[in-house]
């Protein structure tokens, strides 16, 4: 079944400006700027005023309508990122061999370096994405905090770190060692 026209509305809070030119969305807010290329998705953007944008699909089937809702979610996440920011807390879990995590710089790029995972001599490196800041928690032992404006970059960095510490060829019910996401939240908390 084809839908003649389906549209979603995106509300823009005060202090945030959204500019759209040939399906490249640029969101500027108090925490910074985010840009997303949406040329591959066939949607129409209409700026009603400075507080409202309409996103529409004409003669679309279920897949196009689903893509419309995806575009709305992506832009909403960008608006949240430039106003509140995203923060992921990760904890190291180990039974015997303590995991050692450091931040190193090689050739101008930052890496998260994981040593002594399950007693391995192998050094695991995870590249840090642009716009993601990493710090170690001062009041909680064995915790690392990833924060940034883009939820895609922060969550992908957390997933990369969790995946590189996956236990292979052992019973994962017994070998629970790894680095896991313990909390997902915002940098600027609502009062």
Curated annotation (Swiss-Prot):
GO BP annotations listed: cytoplasmic translation
Q: Which Gene3D superfamilies match?
A: Ribosomal protein L6, alpha-beta domain (3.90.930.12)
Report the SS bond pairs.
Answer: none
Q: Drop me one GO molecular function for this one.
A: structural constituent of ribosome
Any Pfam family = Ribosomal_L6
- Ribosomal protein: is it a keyword of this entry? yes
Q: GO cellular component annotations, sorted alphabetically?
A: cytosol; cytosolic large ribosomal subunit
Question: In the UniProt record, does the keyword Hydrolase occur?
Answer: no
Main location class:
cytoplasm
> Where would you find this protein in the cell?
Cytoplasm
Which key words are in the record? Cytoplasm, Ribonucleoprotein, Ribosomal protein
Outline the subunit composition: Component of the large ribosomal subunit (LSU). Mature yeast ribosomes consist of a small (40S) and a large (60S) subunit. The 40S small subunit contains 1 molecule of ribosomal RNA (18S rRNA) and 33 different proteins (encoded by 57 genes). The large 60S subunit contains 3 rRNA molecules (25S, 5.8S and 5S rRNA) and 46 different proteins (encoded by 81 genes).
Q: What does this protein do?
A: Component of the ribosome, a large ribonucleoprotein complex responsible for the synthesis of proteins in the cell. The small ribosomal subunit (SSU) binds messenger RNAs (mRNAs) and translates the encoded message by selecting cognate aminoacyl-transfer RNA (tRNA) molecules. The large subunit (LSU) contains the ribosomal catalytic site termed the peptidyl transferase center (PTC), which catalyzes the formation of peptide bonds, thereby polymerizing the amino acids delivered by tRNAs into a polypeptide chain.
Task: Look up the further comments and give them.
Answer: Present with 76000 molecules/cell in log phase SD medium. There are 2 genes for uL6 in yeast.
The protein's matches in PANTHER family, at most eight in alphabetical order, are given as: 60S RIBOSOMAL PROTEIN L9, 60S/50S RIBOSOMAL PROTEIN L6/L9
The entry's family comment says: Belongs to the universal ribosomal protein uL6 family.
What protein is this chain from? Large ribosomal subunit protein uL6B
């Amino acid at each position: 079944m084809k839908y003649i026209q389906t549209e979603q509305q995106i509300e823009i809070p005060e202090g945030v400006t959204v500019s759209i030119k040939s399906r490249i969305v640029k969101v500027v807010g108090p925490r910074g700027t985010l840009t997303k290329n949406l040329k591959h998705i066939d949607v129409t953007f209409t700026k009603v005023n400075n507080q409202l944008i309409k996103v529409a699909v004409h003669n679309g089937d279920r897949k196009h309508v689903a893509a419309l809702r995806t575009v709305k979610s992506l832009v909403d996440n960008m608006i949240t990122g430039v106003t509140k920011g995203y923060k992921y807390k990760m904890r190291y879990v180990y039974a015997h061999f303590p995991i050692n995590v450091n931040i190193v710089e090689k050739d101008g790029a930052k890496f998260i370096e994981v040593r002594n995972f399950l007693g391995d001599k192998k050094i695991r490196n995870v590249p840090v994405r642009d716009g993601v800041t990493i710090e170690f928690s001062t009041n909680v032992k064995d915790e690392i905090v990833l924060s940034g404006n883009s939820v895609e970059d922060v969550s992908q960095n957390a997933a990369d770190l969790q995946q590189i510490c996956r236990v292979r060829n052992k019973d994962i019910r017994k070998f629970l060692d790894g680095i896991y996401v313990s909390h997902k939240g915002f940098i600027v908390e609502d009062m």
